[in-house]
Amino acid sequence: SEEGRAKLDKAARLYGAPTVIIVCADHDKAWVRKYDQMQTTDIDASILTDHMMLEATEQGLGSLWVCWFDPKIVREEFELPDNLEPINLLALGYADTEEKGPDRHKTERISLDELVMYK
C-alpha cells in the first residue's frame, strides 16, 4: 500500500519500488543448533529471499535484495513484535532499464586474484 511504502521510505531508499517484502526471522520458531545454541535465522532468511528472487525472475519481474535499511524504524513503523527481526527487504517490480548482456563481464569482472586468497 502507499501507506506501507511511505513507512519503508523512512528506513531505506527503495526508489519507488511498487512492492517490497519485509523478510523477518521469527526467533520463537527458529531452529537452534544444539551444540552452541546458534539460530540459523540469517541463513534461513537468505535462502528464502534467494528463492523469491528466482521466482520473481521467472515471472518477469526485477528484484533487489536490500540490506541497507534501519531495522529499528521498520520494527517501529510496522509494530513488529519482539520475536520478529527484520533481516532484509526485497523490492519487486518491472525494471525501468535495459538488461546488460553477459558480455559485460569481459570488461567489468573483478579478477580472481582480487577475490580469492591462496595460502
Predicted regions and their residues:
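Solvent-exposed alpha-helices and their adjacent loops that cap or buttress functional pockets
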Residues: 13-15, 80-82, 107-109
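Small-aliphatic-rich amphipathic alpha-helix that forms the alpha element of a beta-alpha
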Residues: 21, 36-77
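Short secondary-structure boundary segments
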Residues: 25, 68, 94
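Short active-site-adjacent structural elements
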Residues: 31, 73-76, 97-101
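Short, electropositive alpha-helical surface patch
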Residues: 74-87
